[in-house]
């Protein structure tokens, strides 16, 4: 298991999403809301474009930490607030940046703070994992 010091970077990664990524996630999750794959439907409800599923964004963020830790069982808590959508362009897709840093450490666990951004916009607020140590 890793040792944790407040302020240390646990992991950092950019993840590229495409419209195909959204369709694949829809199939796996069963969430076929057309705002996740049809521009016309997204526009008709006032959205700026097709949106990535919030749970996909949340899963991507946690996967960055899981890859660094190598142990999914170490994660004992995970929570986020969805603050802004990730709009996935039909041609260029969308790049989501995840930065995971140690926010706090106690005798039994470490809190990992996630900064998840799309462009200059934070898309997940209060994104934190608790990891057993």
What are these regions, as identified by a protein language model?
Residues 52, 74, 108-110:
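Short loop/turn segments at connectors of secondary-structure elements within structured domains
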Residues 1-52:
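Catalytic strand-loop segment that frames the active site of acyl-thioester-processing enzymes
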Residues 14-16, 81, 128-132:
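Generic structural detector for well-ordered beta-strands
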Residues 51-57, 118-122:
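Noncatalytic linker/hinge segments flanking ATPase motor cores
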Residues 48, 57-99:
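Hydrophobic beta-strand-centered segment that forms part of the acyl-chain substrate-binding groove
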Residues 1-10, 90-133:
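HotDog/MaoC-like acyl-thioester-processing domains
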Residues 12, 75-77, 126:
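Hydrophobic residues on conserved beta-strands that form the core of alpha/beta folds
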């Amino acid at each position: 298991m890793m040792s944790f010091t407040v302020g240390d970077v646990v992991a950092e990664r950019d993840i590229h999403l495409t419209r195909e990524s959204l369709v694949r996630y829809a199939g796996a999750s069963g969430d076929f809301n057309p705002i996740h794959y049809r521009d016309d439907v997204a526009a008709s409800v006032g959205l700026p474009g097709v949106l990535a599923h919030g749970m996909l964004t949340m899963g991507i963020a946690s996967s960055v930490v899981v890859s660094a830790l190598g142990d999914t069982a170490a994660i004992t808590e995970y929570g986020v607030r969805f603050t802004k959508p990730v709009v996935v362009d039909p041609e260029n897709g969308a790049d989501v940046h995840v930065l995971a840093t140690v926010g706090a450490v106690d005798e039994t666990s470490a809190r990992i703070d996630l900064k998840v951004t799309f462009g200059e916009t934070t898309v997940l607020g209060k994104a934190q994992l608790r990891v057993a140590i």
